Amino acid sequence: MSATKTLEAVARDRVGKGAARAVRRQGQIPAVIYGGNQAPQAIAIDLIRARTLIYAGGFKTTVFEIDAGGKKTRAIPRDYQLDPVSGVPLHVDFLRVVAGQTVTVDVPVHFVNEDQAPGIKQKGGTLNVALHTVSLEVAPDQIPDAIEVDLAGREIGDVIHASDLRLPAGTYTGEPTDTVANLLPPTVLGADVEAEEAAVAEAQSAESAEGKAEAEAEATNEKNKSEA
């Protein structure tokens, strides 16, 4: 599971677009902590720190201890906004973590030992991934960093279902039969190209024969006219 990380913040007295712009001019981004049957708390966090955390991966599955002026709050990111052009973080929403609470999070799926899968290594198959993340409903302090899928021994035609994953009991929000990935046979590109070329050649030959027949028919008609 992900370790709790510390995040320094500053409490904000003012909210709104003007206040948010002022925060960003100071090298920070506005954020809010909500939930837990408490009033929302407006805060500001360092832009560089926020950008590093977001782009490092696993941001929305990490529990943070947010220290805003000595007031510490455990919370988990629920959403964030990025500038559509620059990708710079603009705002973050945090959900308070309280005892007995569960949260729904998307946990990444990592595939390991691909070089030990005969269907891929020896037979040239391809791993077709249907689910890059799985949605879990779990206690915040039990969120796994990632779900590993071992491909060792896998053959072409094998299908990996959600029921094959090692997940905390009762946490998966989908169906056990959901396909996570499967191993596809190699595509024979050369054969496809040859078949296409043969079809083109056949069509061209048919067109040539048709043109020749029309020319012969026209010549015969001209000959008959001259003899008449």
Curated annotation (Swiss-Prot):
GO molecular function: 5S rRNA binding; structural constituent of ribosome
Stretch list, region Disordered: 196-228
Annotated Gene Ontology cellular component terms: cytosolic large ribosomal subunit
Stored SUPFAM superfamilies: Ribosomal protein L25-like
Biased composition (Basic and acidic residues): 209-228
One Pfam family in the UniProt entry: Ribosomal_TL5_C
One BP annotation, GO: translation
Keyword field: Ribonucleoprotein, Ribosomal protein, RNA-binding, rRNA-binding
Listed Gene3D superfamilies: Ribosomal protein L25, beta domain, Ribosomal Protein L25, Chain P
Assembly and interaction partners: Part of the 50S ribosomal subunit; part of the 5S rRNA/L5/L18/L25 subcomplex. Contacts the 5S rRNA. Binds to the 5S rRNA independently of L5 and L18.
PANTHER family (UniProt xref): RIBOSOMAL PROTEIN L25/GLN-TRNA SYNTHETASE, ANTI-CODON-BINDING DOMAIN-CONTAINING PROTEIN, RIBOSOMAL PROTEIN L25_GLN-TRNA SYNTHETASE, ANTI-CODON-BINDING DOMAIN-CONTAINING PROTEIN
Function: This is one of the proteins that binds to the 5S RNA in the ribosome where it forms part of the central protuberance.
Entry similarity comment: Belongs to the bacterial ribosomal protein bL25 family. CTC subfamily.
Name used for this protein in its record: Large ribosomal subunit protein bL25
Taxon lineage: Bacteria, Pseudomonadati, Pseudomonadota, Alphaproteobacteria, Hyphomicrobiales
